[in-house]
Amino acid sequence: MTVGFVCGAFDLVHTGHLLMFEECKEFCDYLIVGLCVNPNTMQVEKNKPIESIFERFFRLRSCKFIDEIFVYENREDVEAIMGFLYGKYGKNLIRFMDENYKGRDNLVELNLPIKVHFTSRKHNYSRSNLRKRLKNDV
């Protein structure tokens, strides 16, 4: 069984997120999502989530592509989750990341002998665009 892991805040879940989950699921049998409580605490340039962790968790658990959800607060949690998953699934683990992460050398995933698949972003769906549309329609 191939297990995939992808993480993010998934605030205001939109079509772009769903397309990414669908792409991830095409490459694995079981998809685990890491749900970040507040990405602003790890990267100050990130926006604080609009939705609560409960709202985001509840919405994600209803997605047919997602099999399991881990909640995390910081980079150390992601490292611990990755270590746990690698210990459990070994080379059957795939780490999914947005293609925007290509070329970065500070990723914990690079320290583990696992596959990394960069998901494509061949669309214009984003949280920022959704917020702009909501602001303009109100």
Identify the role of each PLM range.
Residues 1-138:
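Nucleotidyltransferase catalytic core that binds NTPs
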